Design a protein with these regions (language model features):
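N-terminal non-catalytic cap/leader segment that marks the start of a structured domain
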Residues: 1-99, 264-266, 286, 293-297
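Non-heme Fe(II) oxygenase catalytic core, chiefly the N-lobe of the double-stranded beta-helix
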Residues: 112-148, 153, 158-161
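Short beta-strand segments
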Residues: 7, 79-80, 103-104, 127-131, ...
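Catalytic-pocket segment enriched in acidic/His residues
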Residues: 8-10, 62, 66, 87, ...
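Flexible glycine-rich active-site/ligand-binding loops centered on an Asp-His dyad
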Residues: 94, 101-105, 147-180, 219-223
Length: 298
C-alpha cells in the first residue's frame, strides 16, 4: 500500500494511492482514495492505521506537484550521519562505534516536488544527500534489534539538504541541515508489508541529470533494525516519527561541487519512487509580487 499527503484548497489530506507501482512512479497525474485524516502522520497516530487506510472514500485525482511532505509534522526527525562505509572514507572520517545522531526540525521539510528557495547568505555550498527514510508505525521503546522492524509503518525518500558552510561553522550538524523548507520528503509512504528491501536497495542521486550518488543500502554500517534498537533505547519512538538513515558516497562536498541556482536534484530509491526538487537563489515571490514577510503570508 502507498499512502500520500496531498495539498488541497483547504490544507492537506491523506490519500491511499491507486494503481500499479510502475505507473505511479512514471506518471505526473495520480489517482487515489481520500482518507478521513488530514495527513499520513495523523493517520499513523490514529491507532489501527492499516485498517483505517483500507476504508473506502472519495476518489481523488491530483498532480505530483500537489504532494506534500508525506508526514508533514513528525514529532521527531532523527537523522543519522556517517552511516555508509564508502561515504565515511570520502569524508576522511573515522568509522563510528555507535550511530551518530542529529535532529532535523519539521520546518525543514518540503514536498517531494517543491522548489527550494535559499537566500543569498546561504548559497555558498549547497549540497544534496539522498537518503532512505524510515517511518515508525507504533510506539517503540527499548525494543530489540530482532523485533525492531515490526514497528515500521513504511519507507520513503528524503534529501538531507545541507548548507555545508553553515554546517562547518561548528562541530554539530544541525544548523546546516535544518534550513527552512529544503528537505524534500516523499513521494509517498510505501508500507513495510509491500517493501522490505531496507538493507538492500539502490540509492541514486542526480544533479541536472548527471549521476552523483549510486550505491546500495547494503553499505550501511548500522542497519534499519539496529538504528531502531539504538534510538528506542534513548527515548520512545512514536507513530509518525522518522529515522533518516544516512547518505552514500558522492556528496558534493567531497567533490567540491555544489548545487547552483536553477539546478534540480532527483533522488530515486529502488521500489520507492523518486523525489525531485529545484533550487533557486533568493526568496520566493508570490503572485502579488510581495516577499515572504508580507502580511498575505501570515
Amino acid at each position: 500500500m502507498k499512502l500520500a499527503t496531498v495539498k488541497t484548497a483547504f490544507g492537506t489530506t491523506a490519500v491511499r494511492l491507486e494503481g500499479e507501482a510502475t505507473s505511479l512512479m512514471s506518471s505526473t497525474m495520480l489517482t487515489g482514495i481520500e482518507l478521513d485524516f488530514d495527513d499520513v502522520g495523523a493517520l499513523l497516530r490514529s491507532g489501527d492505521w492499516s485498517k483505517a487506510a483500507e476504508l473506502s472514500g472519495e476518489p481523488m485525482v491530483f498532480a505530483t506537484e500537489d504532494l506534500a511532505p508525506v508526514v508533514p509534522q513528525p514529532e521527531k526527525i532523527i537523522c543519522v550521519g556517517l552511516n555508509y562505509a564508502k561515504h565515511i572514507r570520502e569524508m576522511n572520517r573515522e568509522f563510528p562505534e555507535h550511530p551518530t545522531l542529529f535532529i532535523k526540525f519539521a520546518d525543514a521539510l518540503t514536498g517531494p516536488y517543491d522548489d527550494v528557495f535559499i537566500p543569498e547568505y546561504g548559497t555558498a555550498k549547497l549540497d544534496y544527500e539522498g537518503e532512505l527514510a524510515v517511518v515508525i508505525g507504533k510506539r517503540a521503546h527499548r525494543v530489540a534489534e530482532d523485533e525492531a522492524l515490526d514497528f515500521v509503518a513504511g519507507y520513503a525518500i528524503m534529501n538531507d539538504y545541507t548548507l555545508r558552510d553553515i554546517q562547518r561553522q561548528t562541530s554539530q550538524f544541525h544548523a546546516g541541515k535544518s534550513f527552512y523548507r529544503t528537505a524534500g520528503f516523499g513521494p509517498w509512504l510505501t508500507t513495510a508489508d509491500e517493501w522490505s528491501s531496507g538493507n538492500h536497495a539502490r540509492v541514486r542521486t542526480t544533479l541536472d541529470g548527471e549521476v552523483k550518488q549510486d550505491d546500495d543500502t547494503d553499505d550501511l554500517i548500522f542497519s534499519v533494525a539496529k538504528l531502531i534498537e539504538f534510538c528506542s533505547s534513548l527515548y520512545p519512538l512514536n507513530p509518525g516519527d522518522v529515522i533518516v538513515t544516512g547518505t552514500p558516497e558522492g556528496v558534493g562536498f567531497a567533490r567540491d561541487e555544489f548545487i547552483q541556482d536553477g539546478q534540480t536534484v532527483r533522488i530515486e530509491i529502488e521500489g520507492l519512487g523518486h523525489i525531485e526538487n529545484t533550487t533557486h537563489y533568493g526568496e520566493p515571490v508570490s503572485s502579488t509580487g510581495c516577499g515572504p514577510n508580507c502580511s498575505c503570508h501570515s
